[in-house]
Amino acid sequence: DGIAAGWADVERIGGILLLAQMSSRGNLLNPDYTKNTIETGKGSPHVIGYIGNGSSTEEIIQLRSLVGEGQMIWTPGINLDSGAGKMGQRYGNPRDSIASGADIIIVGSGIHGQSDRIAAAKAYANASWDAILERGK
């Protein structure tokens, strides 16, 4: 709420995403942290959503059940080549992430690590859009 107060001083409107889960191997976030973060977020009108673990469909499903349908879930840790990265990253598939309850995928090396970044970005856009349409059926 301190950020929102600062925004009000400069007549800026914005929303906050809270970090509820992480996709990197060995991170220190546990289910109690996730629940406490969500409880904190429910008390603020400025929280528009949560960052979830894109590499774990089970954790996304749990997060969706905790936050409900009225909040967005953004998921980093997304790569069409699911598995592990060179620096401890864990990756999940965009389709699986969306099907499990994520609203937005965050892609890093799956795009910037490719020689044809435009084609890579289109592949992620198509995969996530198709998953959104399937989820809506």
Report the location of each language-model feature.
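Electropositive phosphate-/nucleotide-binding environments in soluble metabolic enzymes
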Residues: 31, 35, 57, 91, ...
